[in-house]
Amino acid sequence: MAVSRAPAPDSACQRMVWLFPLVFCLGSGSEVSQSSSDPQLMNGVLGESAVLPLKLPAGKIANIIIWNYEWEASQVTALVINLSNPESPQIMNTDVKKRLNITQSYSLQISNLTMADTGSYTAQITTKDSEVITFKYILRVFERLGNLETTNYTLLLENGTCQIHLACVLKNQSQTVSVEWQATGNISLGGPNVTIFWDPRNSGDQTYVCRAKNAVSNLSVSVSTQSLCKGVLTNPPWNAVWFMTTISIISAVILIFVCWSIHVWKRRGSLPLTSQHPESSQSTDGPGSPGNTVYAQVTRPMQEMKIPKPIKNDSMTIYSIVNHSREETVALTGYNQPITLKVNTLINYNS
């Protein structure tokens, strides 16, 4: 689109001289004026261009157009267009950065938008019949959305239902942005963080969409319940894994303890015979115990009794075998073998 622009004045004096007839014309106009009731809302993208459209009323011929913008609660003139000679309009541009231009319809074009360009703008038109018409605009500058990410956490409940926590995050955004989750059919779930439950036995795969949007752009990311719950459905729940792990650890500890006890018992040997056979202490004194010979001397009672005639070699020998434990045997002999002690009991019969 072609842009018509007048040469810039060479000095401040020439600029004042050039503006004087314009001010005179504006001052001598009639008191009749009209303006748009509500400002026209315009949206621009950061770093791109925005156009504030200007449309003259039907049957009206513009003589002077002045574009103003508000800065620190005051009106600042940005562009002045003199249309006294429509074939060669004169334009004064006060923008030193040359970001302001005029289209063929005398609309205001702002290039390389910044956040500072946000604000109120007015177009003041003076017609040939000295009528003043004012158009108002509100320009908002937005940044295009980017880096939309989703996070999820799934949990398999005891009844077989998959519980899904969904979060939608828009990074590096300083402006207010609408972020929400939607179910099938564009049904809003009411926010960037939602919790849903999905039972694979009673329902098929479902899709949920996270949508983020502002005045100039929108983004969306979709997820499916089947893909989110695939991991927990194929793996046992955490509580079952914990239970199985605990049982395994306890079993291993018990097995190690039993093996250690057996090893210690084998190293110490079998239990002492005295503890295994407590009756042995009683049986060792018995005269009939095999393995030892005990000699006992028997004294005749004091009562008179008839004594038989002694016979040559009339002595009697009583053998008694006494058993000793292995430990007693080793202590007595130094050898780990049983010994047999024989004691002759002599019974003398004296007349």
UniProtKB/Swiss-Prot annotation:
Q: Which GO terms describe its biological process?
A: adaptive immune response; innate immune response; natural killer cell differentiation; natural killer cell proliferation
- Signal sequence annotation: 1-30
Location of the region described as Disordered in the Swiss-Prot/TrEMBL record = 272-295
The membrane spanning regions, by residue number, are 240-262
Q: Does the keyword field hold Lyase?
A: no
Primary localisation category: membrane
**InterPro entries noted in UniProt:** CD2/SLAM_rcpt, Ig-like_dom, Ig-like_dom_sf, Ig-like_fold, Ig_V-set
- In Pfam terms, one family for this protein is V-set
Residues where Phosphotyrosine occurs?
A: 319
Which pairs are disulfide-linked?
162-229, 168-210
Where the record annotates domain Ig-like V-type, the positions are 36-130
Domain named Ig-like C2-type: residues: 147-210
| Effect of substituting residue 295 to F | Strong inhibitory signaling in germinal center formation (absence of SH2D1A/SAP)
**Result after altering residue 335 to F:** Strong inhibitory signaling in germinal center formation (absence of SH2D1A/SAP)
GO cellular component labels = plasma membrane
Q: Print the miscellaneous field.
A: Isoform 3 ameliorates spontaneous development in a systemic lupus erythematosus transfer model.
Fetch the PANTHER family from UniProt. Answer: SIGNALING LYMPHOCYTIC ACTIVATION MOLECULE, SLAM FAMILY MEMBER 6
Q: What is this protein called?
A: SLAM family member 6
Q: Which gene encodes it?
A: Slamf6
